[in-house]
Regions:
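Glycine-rich phosphate-binding loop and adjacent beta-alpha segment
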Residues: 121-122, 251-317, 346-349
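Hydrophobic/small residue at the entry helix of a nucleotide-binding pocket
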Residues: 165, 189-190, 213, 251
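N-terminal Rossmann NAD(P)H-binding glycine-rich loop of SDR-like oxidoreductase domains
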Residues: 187, 195
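C-terminal hydrophobic helical "lid"/dimerization subdomain
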Residues: 2-5, 13, 168, 299-349
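NAD(P)H dinucleotide-binding glycine-rich loop of Rossmann-like/cofactor-binding domains
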Residues: 71-75, 108-185
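Glycine-rich beta-strand-centered segment in the early N-terminal region that forms part
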Residues: 28-45, 59-111, 148-150
């Protein structure tokens, strides 16, 4: 590390389209603060969070930069994005465990500590602070989880954001082996993760995806696949499932509550078909349904995820890898949605 002073990275210069992403090879390598580690990034996954942040989707106004970060604050530019990170610890701050040096780690994306200080409100790496679309990144040591796995860095980088989001949703919905789940957006990163994680809990899974992706969600472990856009009522009838894991929202959203049984649990962590939905409160209260918004990870979610990976209980669904300088191309491919699983930036390409 002593001879290296600069690194490659992709700077996000402003909210906007792919033109706001700028490749640089002269960015100073960050130094770890007292309780931080410095990670040499092996791979970093592509996900909705980074694109939503880039375009200002989180703003409740018209893309107003004052509230367009994941945490609802103004984003600081330039920003290095990248929430899915696998790499090797190469340096530590004075209060971090030097035994971490040389360890391969996954980074928990939802941060409760940054810049050596505890956070009042959690941050998301790559939004409120720099992330993994770079050769090096710093993070609080508590958020760098050593992992013992034969999987490649690219395969491991497919896990952190999508799988922790999915596991958090299943945790909030208290999913057990006695439950039947409906998962919307089931072919995407979080959806395909939710299939595997729900099956690991012994639950039965109904996956909703496009017609072209029916077999892929069945291959991921779903017990049944439904074509997106078809009537859920016609396919399943009312009161058919115990849990809905929703990543889609949109105009068909009321159907989800109709197929959800009395005392059923609804968990949401995405709205790719639109964030504004129509709710008939009578359905909610007369059926005693429970809602869970899922953003901040519950304590223990990420450590459980690492354990599942190490035991081989879940498998990576790596669709394609791209080099760092092709991030714009990778995000365009991501938005085209003609794949199942995860896309990854592989720093070795």
């Amino acid at each position: 590390m002593a001879d290296l002073q600069t690194m490659r990275a992709i700077y996000l210069m402003a909210h906007g389209g792919p033109e706001a992403l700028v490749y640089r090879n002269d960015i100073p390598i960050p130094a770890p603060r007292r309780s931080e580690v410095l990670i040499k990034v092996g791979a970093a996954g592509i996900n909705n969070t980074d694109i939503n942040t880039r375009v200002g989707w989180y703003s409740k106004g018209e893309g107003d930069a004052a509230d367009a970060s994941w945490g609802g604050q103004a984003l600081s530019f330039p920003r290095i994005q990248g929430a899915d990170i696998c790499g090797e610890v190469v340096d530590v701050g004075e209060q971090a465990d030097p035994g971490l040096i040389g360890k391969r780690v996954l980074v928990e994306p939802c941060l409760r500590e940054a810049n050596g200080e505890p956070l009042v409100s959690p941050w998301y790496i790559g939004s409120e602070c720099d992330g993994g679309f770079a050769d090096y990144v710093t993070v609080a040591a508590r958020h760098a989880y050593p992992i013992d796995s034969s999987l490649s860095d690219a395969e491991l980088a497919s896990f952190p954001c999508s799988y922790s989001t999915a596991e958090n949703m299943l945790t909030r919905a208290q999913v057990t082996e006695n439950d039947t789940l409906l998962i919307t957006g089931a072919s995407g990163g979080v959806g395909s993760a939710a299939i595997q994680l729900a099956k690991a809990r012994g639950a039965s899974v109904i996956a909703v995806a496009s017609g072209a992706k029916q077999q892929s969600v069945l291959d991921a472990g779903a017990n049944r696949a439904l074509i997106r856009g078809n009537s859920l009522h016609d396919e399943l009838g009312d009161n058919a499932v115990d849990v809905v894991i929703d990543l889609v929202g949109g105009e068909d959203w009321p159907e989800l509550l109709n197929i959800l049984r009395p005392f059923g649990r609804y968990a949401v962590s995405g709205a790719i078909a639109g964030p504004i939905v129509e709710l008939d409160l009578r359905t909610l209260y007369l059926k005693d349904q429970r809602f869970a918004g899922c953003t901040v990870l519950d304590e223990g979610v990420f450590s459980r995820l690492v354990g599942l990976i190490e035991r081989g209980d879940i498998k990576p669904l790596l669709a394609r890898s791209f080099p760092l300088e092709s991030l714009s191309e990778a995000q365009a491919f991501f938005l085209d949605k003609q794949f199942t699983g995860k896309l990854v930036i592989d720093m070795g390409l």
